[in-house]
C-alpha cells in the first residue's frame, strides 16, 4: 500500500482521543480498515518503529500496530495489530524514571527520547485484523509499548507523562525544534531517519 507522513507533536490529531472502530453486529469490521492497517505497517516499518497508532498518521481511529521485542536488545519480536484496545497495568512507580532503563522515544517526537515512568506489566484486550478478540500482555519493553500506543489513542504523547527536569527539558526541546504547532510531519523513507537506524 503506502507509507504515510507521521504527524509531529502539536498536531491536534495527536492530542485528541480517537474514535472506536465500529464493529458490526456480526463482528465485521469496516472494509477500508485493512488498507489502513497495511499503511500503518508500511509506515512503522519504514520508520523503524516498535509501534504506531493510527492518529500518528492522521487517522482518528482506535487502532495500533506493533513490532516489538519483549525486552530491550532482544531479537525475537511480536508483531500485530490491536483494534479498540483496552489497557490494564500494574502500579506505576512514583520514583523518578531511570535515565537508562526508562528511556522512551516516539515517532511523533522524532529523534528525541526522555526517561518516562511506566508500569512494569501491561495487558491489552481488543480485536485483531479479523475481528477476533485478543489479549496481549508483557513486561519490560513490550509493556512500555502497550502503554505508549494506547496513550496515543487516548490523545496523549509520552511527553505528557514526563515529570520534573525531564518535563522541562522536553518543553525546551519541542520549542527549539519549532514543534508544538499544527501541520508538521516527517516522511519515513524520504526524510533522514531521526533515530539514525
Swiss-Prot record:
Organism, scientific name: Mycolicibacterium vanbaalenii (strain DSM 7251 / JCM 13017 / BCRC 16820 / KCTC 9966 / NRRL B-24157 / PYR-1) (Mycobacterium vanbaalenii)
Biological role stated in the UniProt entry: Removes the formyl group from the N-terminal Met of newly synthesized proteins. Requires at least a dipeptide for an efficient rate of reaction. N-terminal L-methionine is a prerequisite for activity but the enzyme has broad specificity at other positions.
Domain of life of the organism encoding this protein: Bacteria
Active site: 149
Entry protein name: Peptide deformylase
Cofactor binding annotation: Binds 1 Fe(2+) ion.
E.C. numbers: 3.5.1.88
Binding positions (Fe cation): 106, 148, 152
Family (UniProt): Belongs to the polypeptide deformylase family.
Gene of this entry: def
Hydrolase in keyword set: yes
Catalyzed reactions: N-terminal N-formyl-L-methionyl-[peptide] + H2O = N-terminal L-methionyl-[peptide] + formate
Listed GO MF terms: metal ion binding; peptide deformylase activity
